[in-house]
Regions:
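Short glycine-/aliphatic-rich beta-strand segments at the starts of folded cytosolic domains
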Residues: 1-21
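C-terminal low-complexity, charged extensions that often adopt amphipathic alpha-helices
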Residues: 3-4, 72-103
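Short beta-strand-to-loop capping motifs
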Residues: 17-19, 53-57
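Ser/Thr-Pro-rich, acidic low-complexity intrinsically disordered regions of eukaryotic RNA-binding
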Residues: 22-29
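Short acidic amphipathic segments
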Residues: 29-50, 54
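Charge-rich, low-aromatic oligomerization/scaffolding segments with amphipathic character
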Residues: 57-74
Length: 103
């Protein structure tokens, strides 16, 4: 899987990935993250092409092992799965409330 490093520090890396990070893909990533305890957090950006990984200091190689561990066929299936709704954030609630008031 070809990824592009956009930013990196001692315990965080932001990558551009070749798959869309939909809600179903996010759930799949969280499930697979359990096998890599040194990865502490996965953050998917709203543009669905960038992902940030937070990891324990000195374990940046575990991020690349994690990405190699992911199955491409499963990722493709999850990208097409629109039955899983994204988590509702407080901003989404406020925006929908304002929209209903205006309409």
């Amino acid at each position: 899987m070809k990824v592009t490093i956009k930013a990196q520090s001692k315990n965080r890396v932001r990558l551009e990935v070749p798959f869309r990070c939909t809600a179903a893909v996010q759930l799949y990533l969280e499930e697979e993250k359990r096998l890599f305890p040194e990865i502490t957090q996965i953050i998917c950006y709203k543009d669905e092409k960038h992902i940030a990984f937070t990891f324990e200091t000195g374990h940046e190689s575990s991020v690349y092992r994690f990405l190699d561990h992911l199955e491409v066929t499963t990722l493709n299936e999850k990208q097409r799965d629109f039955t899983v709704d994204a988590q509702v954030t407080p901003v989404d609630i406020v925006v929908s409330h304002i929209y209903r008031k205006l309409v």
